[in-house]
Amino acid sequence: MERGMRLFSSLVLVLLLVTATEMGPKVAEARTCESQSHRFKGACLSDTNCASVCQTEGFPAGDCKGARRRCFCVKPC
């Protein structure tokens, strides 16, 4: 009986923790739009270099992505 009560208490505690984390304030994540850089040449090995080129194209940021290491410029949609 004591073991069953302990198991029940543990399950209730886990249930309360799960529901409490979902009751917090909801923050809407901004969508991001990506566009392959038109000015970046060669393999993209540095996110910093990619971001610099993307800024000249009017984007606030840029990242190297994919197996072929291409520079993608990123902005909020």
From Swiss-Prot:
Example GO biological process: defense response
Entry keyword set: Antimicrobial, Disulfide bond, Fungicide, Plant defense, Secreted, Signal
GO-annotated cellular components: extracellular region
Compartment annotation: Secreted
Extent of the signal sequence: 1-30
S-S bridge residues: C33-C77, C44-C64, C50-C71, C54-C73
CDD domains (alphabetical): Knot1 (cd00107)
InterPro entries: Defensin_plant, Scorpion_toxin-like, Scorpion_toxin-like_sf
Domain of life assignment: Eukaryota
Family: Belongs to the DEFL family.
Name of the protein this chain belongs to: Defensin-like protein
